[in-house]
Regions:
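Glycine/charged-rich beta-loop-alpha catalytic/anionic-binding loops adjacent to active sites
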Residues: 53-64, 91-96
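Short acidic-glycine loop/turn motifs at beta-strand connectors
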Residues: 51-54, 132-134
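Short beta-strand scaffold segments in enzyme catalytic cores
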Residues: 42-51
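C-terminal binding/interaction regions
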Residues: 1-35, 85-155
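Short Gly/Pro-enriched turn/cap motifs at secondary-structure boundaries
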Residues: 37-39
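Active-site- and interface-proximal helix/loop "cap" or "latch" segments in soluble metabolic
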Residues: 72, 80-89
Length: 155
């Protein structure tokens, strides 16, 4: 039997010319790119997590010479957000890459799993916004579509 998975998302070409994204958040994302520790990949990534209260938690990728020991920006931000606000829902996760010549980068598999489980914990989806520094953006209502067959343990 054949099955089909459909992914719904919005695209924004040259997002700087739209008023869709908060200037405060996009400026913060750009500023944070400078604080990423990416000496091995030279690929800075920043993330801002907006909680339902409006609180903003930030993160950047932090690479390590023992490659699996580094962390991606979105994982840093999401885990810090849930540690600081364990009973508050995440409203939006923004991820910006410093690379301006390509489409926005999608989260890696480990980050998709963490984002998905975070949504399950709070029982409601959050918006995921992927931006590159100068051009395009992708917006998803929830992360389930990015990881349709997530890993879960029996409860």
């Amino acid at each position: 039997m054949e099955h089909q998975i459909t992914l719904h998302y919005r695209t924004y070409e040259n997002w700087r010319k739209t008023s869709v994204f908060s200037e405060e958040i996009t400026e913060r994302l750009e500023s944070l790119l400078k604080t990423a520790h990416a000496p091995y990949s030279n690929y800075p990534v920043s993330s801002v997590v907006v909680m339902q209260s409006g609180a903003m938690i930030v993160g950047t990728n932090q690479e390590n010479a023992a490659f699996p020991s580094g962390l991606c920006a979105e994982r840093v931000a999401v885990l810090a957000a849930k540690a600081a606000h364990p009973h508050e829902a995440i409203q939006t996760v923004y991820i910006m890459t410093g690379e301006s010549e390509r489409e926005p980068a999608a989260p890696c598999g480990s980050c998709r799993q963490v984002l998905h489980e975070t949504e399950l914990r709070q029982t409601e989806p959050f918006e995921l916004i992927l931006l590159n520094k100068t051009h395009n953006a992708l917006a998803f209502n929830g992360v389930k579509g990015l990881l349709p067959f997530s890993f879960t343990l029996p409860r």
